[in-house]
């Protein structure tokens, strides 16, 4: 038997933990998508991930997202043409970090999903630029449910109103919400952040905002994804548990 690489072993471990958290929460393991956050990964590690079947990749900086997508998309297409069964059916890039309006054009070129829509002005710019490309861009509303001033995201109390505004934009498709918990907090505080986020999600559902498209809760990173899954996460953003680095490397704080 060929020896598994360190990355393959880490991926096995993370996928096992996701499956165990799903079982504990009485959820199907397929209900949670692993997004590999490639911020600290070397290009060859990302290529290896693709060949291990991981098709959802996340970056927190617009420029790096564009560069990585250019490098990897070509490799992915070549593997597909060679009939490589191991590579995933689709390669999806996720913009998970704070997005400035002047970077919107570049991000729309490559992002399948923008997780970090946290203001009306950003939503309007995304809507304008997506319309120019004749595309309907899936987005998540970022909510600051931990109420930490260092975190991006709309305040919980303003989330429904902003969601309604996004939902009315013809070139955007609101498919869910995203949040980040504080890395240093207690488990109880982290869980509270995720519960509040789920409550906002339920409130949007109740108001029929987003319609049937509203189905994603992007929450949980390397240090807290099991708690997030127990509280309903459908996407977890994992970097350090796969590639090393210090906890919170997946996060982007306010400058």
What are these regions (language model features)?
Residues 1-225, 231, 243-245:
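Conserved alpha/beta-domain cores
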Residues 235, 249-255:
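Active-site loop ensemble at the mouth of alpha/beta enzyme cores that anchors a bound cofactor
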């Amino acid at each position: 038997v060929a020896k598994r690489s360190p990355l393959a072993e880490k991926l096995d471990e993370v996928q096992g933990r996701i499956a165990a958290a799903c079982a504990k929460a009485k959820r199907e393991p397929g209900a949670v998508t692993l997004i590999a956050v490639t911020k600290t990964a070397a290009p060859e590690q990302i290529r290896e991930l693709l060949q291990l079947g991981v098709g959802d990749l996340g970056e927190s900086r617009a420029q790096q997202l564009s560069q990585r997508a250019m490098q990897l998309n070509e490799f992915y297409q070549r593997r597909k043409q060679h009939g490589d069964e191991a590579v995933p059916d689709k390669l999806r890039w996720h913009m998970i970090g704070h997005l400035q309006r002047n970077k919107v054009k570049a991000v729309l070129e490559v992002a399948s999903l923008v997780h970090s829509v946290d203001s009306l002005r950003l939503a309007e710019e995304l809507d304008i630029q997506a319309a120019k490309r004749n595309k309907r861009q899936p987005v998540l509303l970022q909510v600051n449910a931990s109420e930490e001033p260092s975190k991006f995201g709309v305040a919980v109390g303003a989330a429904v109103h902003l969601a309604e505004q996004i939902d009315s934009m013809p070139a955007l498709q609101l498919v869910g919400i995203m949040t980040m918990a504080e890395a240093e907090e207690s488990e109880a505080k982290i869980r509270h952040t995720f519960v509040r986020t789920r409550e906002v999600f339920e409130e949007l559902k109740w108001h029929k905002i987003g319609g049937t498209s509203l189905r994603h809760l992007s929450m949980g990173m390397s240090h807290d994804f099991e708690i997030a899954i127990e509280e309903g996460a459908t996407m977890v953003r994992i970097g350090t548990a796969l590639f090393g680095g210090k906890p919170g490397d997946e996060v982007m704080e306010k400058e």
